[in-house]
Regions:
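Transmembrane alpha-helix interface/packing and boundary motifs in multi-pass membrane proteins
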Residues: 220-225, 256-265, 297-303, 444, ...
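Membrane-interfacial loop-to-helix junctions in multi-pass transporters
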Residues: 134-139, 200-213, 239-253, 284-290, ...
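Membrane-water interface regions at transmembrane-helix termini and the short interhelical loops
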Residues: 31, 58-62, 83-96, 143-158, ...
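Long, contiguous bundles of hydrophobic transmembrane helices that form the permeation core
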Residues: 2-44, 329-429, 532-620, 648-658
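Conserved, well-structured core domains of diverse proteins
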Residues: 1-131, 138-142
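Core transmembrane alpha-helical segments of multi-pass membrane transporters/permeases
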Residues: 111, 150, 155, 163-180, ...
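Hydrophobic transmembrane alpha-helices that form the pore/transport pathway of multi-pass ion
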Residues: 234-302, 308, 312-315, 321, ...
Length: 658
């Protein structure tokens, strides 16, 4: 191997090195705060402290009245959004009218907050659907809806904004829609009451989860990453796979999986690990589209990887009424299957391309062992969750522990300025999550009160004649369509409202149903035509976004199959006896292996098309819930592997050994 091919990560990109080793204090949030006017910085700093103290008080001291703490949480999020994203900066023309608009939004948010705080006690005695909305209440409700929708437009997406508009239009003009989805409509005062006071409205369970759980975990994740933990996870993934077949691609899988356990954000994972792994993959011999697809698929898996999954998983626990630890435990096997499939896939692609163990492209980072203690906060968090500690308290204590751990080394020790910046970053992320959870309340309130969910359940039952597979297929397609336009949290919440009752009506448990819907909401991030994680990775790789999207879709095929598998085999989600769970584990691993080999087109040797199809067929047979299908699947798996191994001996010189 020539010296020219020897590559060091330190020469790849200064930003990538900073992300891996946390040597660069001038982070994105630091730059953002540095460039904003001082009055906005100080205002945000004060709001950050107030919001943090409030959140600590309600968990460590005593909870407040729900009509006090929920609106306060919502309004603090709104004001934070207005200050971080002023319209005067977003617009091309710096018209003073935009300042007036921003001031109006801040003032109206404060007015909404004042209304609820001053009427919190009386609202506890208000009878929903009986007491008439006063003029003041209608005005407050209108302002609340306007603020939430404008916040969605600024920090979430225009897609979600237009979806909300569609639901509002349906609420008002439902009586003019022909067919099954026609209903009498909701009067304007009634609609405002539903959205502001209804248990399925803006202050419903999604926002309750944002207040009671998500805020604390988002702040913890920010501190854990900025205190050195994130860098250790990335470096660990890179080191574990260095000097192996397809090492950089495996590094992307491992690093993104490890980082995803903390962040739970596909795009954030791509942006963080992709700047390291994608250039390395390209230099090793992977095509730009392959490199980008591997990174986007691996990063998307972070939302389904315990212990800290996507925000939707916390909301799922709230909806089902179970401990989050149960959700996380149930998600382990599907997550392992997902990452195992991607890991095997990149290995087989490397073998097919003839890439050896020593490609000359190596990662040179700091030693891992001297820094491994920085992972203690995440280890302690997992232990506390398993031991039954409440999620908020666990996150609070582990956040404090992260700061203490960071103080051990001068490299990660947090100055007061960096401490404030990190806290402000965590609060900013909390605000950006609170907004879509509140927005989902608008849509859920309309769906529930218009009877759409019942009608969809009836439609599924009629069209599929009670067929579970048809119901699952319709729900999966609906989730994918929603997930293409909406964030995972919003897609999951709407899909659960629309499809869950129909699936559960066919005898499927709440946990399995919700996990099925959640999975498809997640993989929509890498499903064309709208696949934001894939597009982000394609931008880093300089690859075709369209080709990357389809490549990622094919690489992640396991994620589209596993949800059907755990519906028919609930033992995959730990719903069954010990024997059933062990069998499910073995079956899933075997099916995952065959799927990965079929997609890569390699099993001991390059596969012909009919051999790849045989791998797919046997993998699908494994999903069927019967002893006969297990026997046929195992026999088929053994035959395929034996045949490919024996015939592969003739071509042994075409690929290097593992």
């Amino acid at each position: 191997m020539s010296n020219e091919k020897e590559t060091k990560v330190s020469a790849l990109d200064a930003k990538a090195k900073a992300l891996a080793n946390e040597e660069d204090e001038d982070t994105k949030i630091a730059k953002l705060l540095k460039n904003m006017p001082k009055w906005r910085f100080y205002s945000l700093a004060v709001l950050t402290v107030i919001w943090t103290v409030f959140q600590l008080y309600i968990k460590l001291v005593k909870p407040l009245d729900p009509w006090f703490q929920l609106p306060l949480h919502m309004c603090l999020a709104l004001v934070v959004v207005w200050l971080y994203n002023p319209m005067v900066e977003k617009s091309k023309s710096h018209n003073k009218l935009w300042w007036i608009y921003d001031i109006f939004l801040i003032a109206s948010s404060c007015f909404i907050c004042w209304f609820f705080l001053s009427h919190a006690e009386q609202l506890n005695y208000r009878i929903f659907n009986v007491d008439v909305m006063t003029t003041t209440e209608v005005i407050v409700a209108v302002l609340l809806v306007i603020n939430v929708m404008e916040a969605v437009r600024r920090v979430v997406s225009m897609s979600l904004f237009w979806v909300i508009c569609f639901f509002l239009a349906y609420a008002w003009f439902g009586q003019y829609i022909p067919g099954l989805f026609r209903f009498s409509g909701i009067s304007f005062p009634k609609l405002m009451e539903v959205l502001m006071y209804g248990e399925n409205g803006i202050f419903g369970s999604p926002l309750v989860t944002s207040l009671g759980t998500l805020f604390y975990f988002l702040v913890f994740g920010t501190f854990f990453s900025n205190c050195g933990g994130g860098g250790v996870l990335i470096d660990g993934g890179m080191k574990l796979s260095d000097k192996t077949v397809g090492g950089p691609a495996k590094a992307a899988v491992i690093s993104s999986g490890l980082l995803g356990m903390v962040s739970g954000s596909a795009i954030a994972n791509v942006s963080t690990t992709g700047v390291l792994t994608i250039p390395l993959m390209k230099k090793t011999g992977y095509d730009p589209e392959e490199a980008a697809a591997v990174e986007s698929v691996a990063s998307t898996g972070g939302q389904i990887m315990p212990p800290i999954m996507g925000a939707g998983a916390f909301i799922m626990a709230e909806i089902i009424g179970v401990q989050y630890a149960q959700i996380a435990a149930a998600a382990v096997l599907p997550a392992v299957a997902y990452f195992l499939a991607v890991f095997i896939l990149v290995h087989m692609i490397a073998k097919k391309k003839g890439l050896g163990k020593d490609s000359g492209v190596h990662y040179e980072g700091k030693p891992i062992l001297p820094r491994v203690y920085r992972l203690l906060p995440i280890i302690v968090l997992v232990i506390m969750i398993i031991m039954g500690y409440s999620l908020p308290r666990s996150a609070i204590y582990c956040t404090i522990f992260s700061i203490i751990i960071a103080a051990i080394s001068p490299e990660t020790r947090m100055s007061p300025r960096k401490l404030l910046q990190t806290l402000m970053d965590g609060v900013r992320q909390a605000a950006n999550i609170a907004i879509p959870t509140a927005a989902c309340g608008i849509m859920i309130g309309i769906v529930v009160n218009s009877g759409v969910a019942v009608k969809i359940a009836k439609l599924i039952g009629t069209s599929g004649e009670g067929s579970l597979f048809i119901a699952l297929l319709i729900a999966a397609l609906g989730c994918l369509l929603l997930g293409m336009a909406l964030p995972t949290v919003a897609a999951y919440l709407i899909a659960v409202t629309l499809f869950a009752s129909a699936i559960q009506g066919l005898g499927i448990s709440a946990l399995v149903t919700n996990m099925f819907i959640f999975y498809f909401g997640v993989v929509a991030q890498i499903t064309p035509p709208v696949c934001l994680a894939s597009f982000t990775a394609a931008g880093i790789a300089g690859a075709s976004a369209w080709k990357t999207g389809w490549k990622a879709f094919s690489f992640a095929i396991t994620a589209f199959i596993v949800p059907f598998a755990f519906v028919y085999r609930p033992a995959i989600l730990l719903e069954g006896t010990a024997v059933e769970i062990i069998i499910a584990y073995c079956i899933v691993i075997a099916a995952t292996y065959l799927l990965a080999c079929g997609i890569a087109g390699y099993l001991f040797r390059p596969l012909k098309m009919w051999e790849r199809i045989a791998c797919y067929i046997v993998a699908f047979i494994f999903i069927l819930p019967s002893s006969m299908s297990d026997i046929i699947g195992i026999a088929g798996c053994v035959l395929i592997m034996a045949y490919c191994f024996m015939t592969g001996k003739k071509n042994a010189n075409k690929a290097q050994p593992v």
